[in-house]
């Protein structure tokens, strides 16, 4: 426009004022802070979405939801697809967020750290509890226990009254007392206690043999995928009692490592040597290829059963413990949900009787009840475990060794918990140096 009139100037001033009220001048710096907090480096900030990988796209979409200080944040599984550092940053962001957050999550540590209230949805009804996840769990279980105890006392009282009435109702001297007790009996009502709709599968791994002295030796492992170095100079030795959590800044690193260990990817260089007494069973991060057929669940599992186990009664019973009951075992595996596929894979893993479990993000797609059951099963497992996870509590309660993996080597800490690993300043400096 050639001439900028006084009216144009006034309108421009109004728009600038509105822009300032919306914190427009802070928009770009705020976006940068959010992206960097979610581990999107600055050199990627001006790329188009189509140029990012799947994990980076998820982070950008999450940053988009967090942007602009909304009145209400609705977050559905926000930790899915995030690395450990991004989850820790998100926890602090939400703790300090001044407005309302409504979140669905299966990460117990995340719920404990972030939430001030829990909304319990069961039997189509919702009940609000003040407190975090652990407080809700204890409170709800205590409430049900007290209700059951009260019902038991009422049942004893009912039995006692019924016995008195039956004994003395025909006795003239006791008839008034019997009538009084009848009235008391009529007033007693038992609480209707419905069992929770939540169901816990049974997860238990029993190795067929013990591991000898040698578990796994990895020397100078390097892997390149599509021209990008994923692993470089990776070396470590695992011992028979190790339950190892493998961490990385992105999932492709740990997934690639596990695929190499299981012989699915040939490394550019380096060697992998399993101990002669070891037997491995593997749960991949994406098990979809295992279900690319039209077998029923029971026939799919039959492929992995021994001769003694190849029996419909046994297989149906086994699947029943994994929450596939009745005719559900006749469902085709190619239509299963993500959680159902993981439960099938865990069934296969259990039938293998292997003494080494290799689990790539095993809590992915599982509900809280299944995560809890798996968590307990792995704690009780007498063999060795190599696993990757983003679930803080899962790692903390299972792992006795932490290995951080990158395209620049590893940081390896034995005889440690996850919390100790995170709190050790020297270790965290070494981790930072991996990605410098």
Which residue ranges define each predicted feature?
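Leucine-rich amphipathic alpha-helices with coiled-coil/heptad-repeat character
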Residues: 4, 19, 26, 154, ...
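Generic structural signal for secondary-structure transition and capping sites
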Residues: 99, 163, 170, 190-193, ...
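ABC-family P-loop ATPase nucleotide-binding domain
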Residues: 193-215
């Amino acid at each position: 426009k050639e001439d900028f009139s006084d009216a144009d100037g006034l309108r421009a001033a109004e728009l600038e004022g509105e822009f300032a009220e919306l914190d427009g001048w802070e928009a770009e710096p705020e976006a940068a802070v959010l992206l960097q907090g979610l581990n999107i480096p600055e050199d990627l900030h001006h790329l188009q979405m189509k140029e990012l990988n799947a994990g980076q796209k998820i982070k950008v979409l999450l940053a988009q939801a967090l942007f602009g200080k909304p009145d209400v944040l609705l977050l559905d599984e926000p930790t899915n697809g995030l690395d450990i550092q991004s989850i820790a940053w998100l926890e602090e962001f939400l703790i300090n967020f001044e407005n309302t957050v409504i979140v669905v999550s299966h990460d117990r540590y995340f719920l404990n750290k972030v939430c001030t209230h829990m909304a319990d949805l069961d039997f189509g009804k919702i009940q609000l509890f003040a407190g975090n996840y652990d407080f809700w769990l204890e409170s709800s279980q205590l409430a049900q226990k007290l209700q059951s105890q009260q019902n038991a006392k009422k049942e004893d009282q009912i039995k006692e009254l019924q016995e008195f009435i039956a004994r003395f109702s025909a006795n003239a001297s006791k008839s008034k007392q019997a009538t009084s007790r009848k009235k008391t009996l009529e007033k007693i009502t038992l609480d209707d206690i419905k069992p929770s709709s939540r169901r816990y599968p049974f997860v238990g791994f029993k190795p067929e043999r013990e591991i000898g002295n040698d578990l796994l030796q990895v020397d100078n492992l390097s892997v390149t995928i599509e021209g990008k170095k994923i692993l470089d100079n990776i070396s470590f030795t695992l011992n028979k009692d190790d339950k190892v959590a493998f961490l990385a800044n992105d999932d492709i690193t740990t997934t690639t490592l596990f695929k190499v260990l299981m012989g699915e990817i040939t490394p550019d260089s380096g060697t992998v040597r399993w101990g002669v007494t070891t037997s491995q069973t593997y749960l991949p991060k994406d098990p979809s290829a295992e279900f690319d057929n039209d077998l029923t669940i029971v026939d799919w599992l039959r492929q992995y059963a021994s001769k003694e186990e190849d029996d419909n009664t046994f297989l149906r019973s086994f699947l029943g413990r994994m929450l596939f009951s009745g005719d559900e075992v006749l469902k085709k595996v190619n239509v299963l949900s993500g959680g159902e596929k993981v439960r099938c894979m865990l069934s296969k893993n259990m039938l293998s009787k292997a003494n080494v479990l290799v689990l790539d993000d095993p809590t992915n797609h599982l509900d809280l009840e299944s995560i809890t059951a798996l968590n307990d099963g792995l704690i009780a497992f007498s063999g060795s475990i190599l696993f990757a996870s983003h679930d803080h509590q899962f790692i903390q309660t299972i792992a006795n060794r932490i290995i951080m993996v990158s395209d620049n080597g590893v940081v390896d800490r034995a005889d440690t918990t996850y919390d100790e690993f995170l709190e050790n300043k020297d270790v965290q400096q070494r981790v930072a140096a991996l990605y410098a």
